[in-house]
């Protein structure tokens, strides 16, 4: 029997989400650029959010011009994620393959969407319309990863069952974090939870991971193949830096003998090996190619990943964010459902430090994919000396403290220099 959550404000929260969806279905955003007097009124979250839909949110570029994003355009949308999600329905409804979110944990943190700390009802009312809109953006075979700690895990799981249907729950993954928390009151918590739902579980394939991660994924004759260029070596032991350790096809007889050549020729004939020109001497490397479906295995439910600070240090952003999520974790989640879908769209509407954008870039770098990201982040000040130093050095802000969204954008730029030089993304503002 399914347990149904009840909390003060539940009816209003579901009604809001459904109304925003219905309003979006009624037609595209007006995009006239006019703000109603309700746009910046204060008050409670649901009171303000309840006014959404009266003028239909839309997206503007840096010149103040309404922008209708292309489907596979990399986006950073600055503003409240509820109107942003509604605005995205015009272009992305039913097109998102993966949603990854790491929402505020209801800790009372000032750098979140002003949750109330240990007020489960407020957190549930906050998340409900956002999850309803996220579901509308997902493809029929889309999945949502909801990453959080134990403060809201049980409540979030029941809420997710109600929104997606318990039959569409795909389980819970455990993220094993770096060790720490020696001052914990009872015991050291070394893990987080990642709850997973599908829009339609019957359409979702297995969650995959690579068996041989050092190899490269490529498309050969229309098929995705795992490519290993280091199959044959001239010898064992350490190699001097810059020296060629691969054994070229033309040198097999001299180094390994006729028997080894016959073995390689047989695998060339069967298609297990292919030859590729290598170097400047007209020789060929022996390359093993394996169909991607044979080079993958199902993901294990416990994922070990170090803290995200290790990812920020090489970007010159160390110490800017308190608890950034690890790129390898998000990359593994994204890749698990896009292993055979390298053109997928990935959405993160609690973008924070921008880990998801870098994870998408890293996944594309790994298999030459063209996945795109859609990030949403509020322009809240991040009161950190390191954050101020980064933005001051880049010359992008003269504010007392930079906003989180400014730093999200800066991380995307710096990560692109490493993973995807020349990558472009469009920064937009949501207009309510």
At which residue positions do the language-model features occur?
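Conserved S-adenosyl-L-methionine
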Residues: 5-7, 120-124, 151-153, 327-416
């Amino acid at each position: 029997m399914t347990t149904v959550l009840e909390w003060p404000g539940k009816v209003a929260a579901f009604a809001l989400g459904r109304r925003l969806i219905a309003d979006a279905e009624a037609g595209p955003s007006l995009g006239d650029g006019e703000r109603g007097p309700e746009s910046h009124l204060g008050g409670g979250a649901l009171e303000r959010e309840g006014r959404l839909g009266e003028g239909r949110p839309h997206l503007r570029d840096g010149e103040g011009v309404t922008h209708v994003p292309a489907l596979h355009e990399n986006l950073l949308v600055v503003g409240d994620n509820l109107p942003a999600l509604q605005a995205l329905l015009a272009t992305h409804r039913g097109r998102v393959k993966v949603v990854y979110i790491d929402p505020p944990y209801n800790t009372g943190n000032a750098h979140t969407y002003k949750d109330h700390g240990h007020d489960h009802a407020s957190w549930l009312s906050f998340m409900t319309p956002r999850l309803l809109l996220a579901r509308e953006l997902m493809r029929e075979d889309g999945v949502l990863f909801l990453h959080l700690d134990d403060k809201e895990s049980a409540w979030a799981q029941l809420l997710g069952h109600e929104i997606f249907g318990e039959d569409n729950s795909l389980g819970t993954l455990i993220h094993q974090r770096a060790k720490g928390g020696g001052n914990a009151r009872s015991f050291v918590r070394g893990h987080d939870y990642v709850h997973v739902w599908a829009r339609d579980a019957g359409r979702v394939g297995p969650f995959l991971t690579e068996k041989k991660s050092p190899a490269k994924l490529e498309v050969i004759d229309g098929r995705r193949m795992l490519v290993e260029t280091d199959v044959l070596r001239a010898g064992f032991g350490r190699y001097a830096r810059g020296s060629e350790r691969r054994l070229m096809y033309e040198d097999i007889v001299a180094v390994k003998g006729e028997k080894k050549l016959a073995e390689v020729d047989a695998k060339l004939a069967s298609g297990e090996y292919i030859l590729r020109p290598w170097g400047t001497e007209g020789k060929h490397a022996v390359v093993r190619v394996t169909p991607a479906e044979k080079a993958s295995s199902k993901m294990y439910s416990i994922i070990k990943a170090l803290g995200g600070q290790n990812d920020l240090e090489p970007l010159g952003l160390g110490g800017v964010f308190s608890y950034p999520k690890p790129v390898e974790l998000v990359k593994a989640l994204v890749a698990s459902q896009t292993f055979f879908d390298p053109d997928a769209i990935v959405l993160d509407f609690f973008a924070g430090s921008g880990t998801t954008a870098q994870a998408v870039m890293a996944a594309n770098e790994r298999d030459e994919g063209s996945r795109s990201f859609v990030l949403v982040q509020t322009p809240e000040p991040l009161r950190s000396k390191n954050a101020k130093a980064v933005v001051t050095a880049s010359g992008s802000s003269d504010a007392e403290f930079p906003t989180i969204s400014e730093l999200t954008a800066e991380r995307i730029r710096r990560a692109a220099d490493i993973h995807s030089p020349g990558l472009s993304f469009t920064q937009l503002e949501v207009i309510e």
